[in-house]
Each structure stands twice: as structure tokens, then as C-alpha cells.
Amino acid sequence: MSVESQPVEKISELPAGSTTVVHAEKAQKLIQKLGLKRVEGITRVAMRRPKNILLIINEPIVYKSSNNAYIVLGKVTVEDMAAQARAFNESQKQATETKEEAAITEESGDAQPADTAKIEESFEQEKAVDETGVDAKDIELVMAQANVSRAKAVTALKENNSDVVNAIMSLTM
């Protein structure tokens, strides 16, 4: 007599109120016939995949075979850790930008004439930087990677003999 021809009985191990299909119940009967033992006390299973993707099963039904292999049943949810990290970094970046903007507006309201003179001097210094001997593409790259002004990028490139990597490292470290 095959499993399919047997009347399907509700298995007591299924959570009450779950909407399982007949095939899942039959699969659980077959699992029990294979001699697998149910493992109690597991509330969450996480499986790591390449590229920081996690497969998460909450409230799983877990069986253990005689050769220490585990069979996990339950609803799988996919979590992309890389996307979550990018979203977290963006939110942190926005938070720091708003804090910086608030600090700038606070400072600009209380700015004294001496402060404005210093700001004007720094703008004049940035305009007066000599870019001879430095490639424009290298300057743009250093500006983008180190998030600095053009004058600082040119200065760093000149100090590091037009070595882009060392210029970026000197500006960011």
C-alpha cells in the first residue's frame, strides 16, 4: 500500500492553524518512515549564500538523520545583506550631512568678520593652486575618491609624485 493511497491524517508536529498542503503532510510521513528524528528547540535557521545573501527560516521543523545531516522545513525568506548595508550607509551619510548642514547654518548665523576673512583667504588659496605637471583626470579621480577640493587634490598629487593611490591614502588617512 503506497503512501498516496493511505488516508491523510494531520500530523501532530505541524503547528496548529497552519495551512499545509496534502503534499507537505505526505512528505512529513515519508520523513518519519525514513527514521529521521525531530530536533526540538530550534527557532531560526540561517543559511549563507554567495554575495552576502541569507536564506532565513523562522520557526523551522528540523529533522536529523543518522549521518548527522539535517533536513529543514519551513517558509524561506531571502535577505540581501549587501542591499541592507548599502541602505544603512546611505541613511548614515544623510544623517551626517544633515548634521553638517545644521552646524554650518549655526556657524553662519554667528559668523564674525574675522571668520569670513579666513574663508575668503582659503577660497583664494584654492584658486591659486598650480596644476602644471598633474593630469586633470588624476585630479578628478582624487577629488571623487577622497571627497576633497581641487586644491587639496592637486597638493596631494604633487606631494606624492602624481601617484593617485598614495594621494588618496594621504587625504583619507
Swiss-Prot record:
It comes from the Eukaryota. CDD domains: NAC_NACA, UBA_NAC_euk. PROSITE patterns: NAC_AB. Gene3D superfamilies: DNA helicase RuvA subunit, C-terminal domain, Nascent polypeptide-associated complex domain. Keywords: Cytoplasm, Nucleus, Phosphoprotein, Protein transport, Transport. Residues 134-171 form the UBA domain. The modification Phosphoserine is found at S122. One of its GO terms (cellular component) is nascent polypeptide-associated complex. Residues 21-85 form the NAC-A/B domain. Disulfide bonds: none annotated. Residues 89-117 are annotated as: Disordered. One of its GO terms (biological process) is 'de novo' cotranslational protein folding. GO terms for molecular function: unfolded protein binding. It is found in: Cytoplasm; Nucleus. Component of the nascent polypeptide-associated complex (NAC), a dynamic component of the ribosomal exit tunnel, protecting the emerging polypeptides from interaction with other cytoplasmic proteins to ensure appropriate nascent protein targeting. The NAC complex also promotes mitochondrial protein import by enhancing productive ribosome interactions with the outer mitochondrial membrane and blocks the inappropriate interaction of ribosomes translating non-secretory nascent polypeptides with translocation sites in the membrane of the endoplasmic reticulum. Part of the nascent polypeptide-associated complex (NAC), consisting of ucp15 and btf3. NAC associates with ribosomes via btf3. Belongs to the NAC-alpha family. PANTHER family: NASCENT POLYPEPTIDE ASSOCIATED COMPLEX ALPHA SUBUNIT-RELATED. This is Nascent polypeptide-associated complex subunit alpha. The lineage of its organism: Eukaryota, Fungi, Dikarya, Ascomycota, Taphrinomycotina.
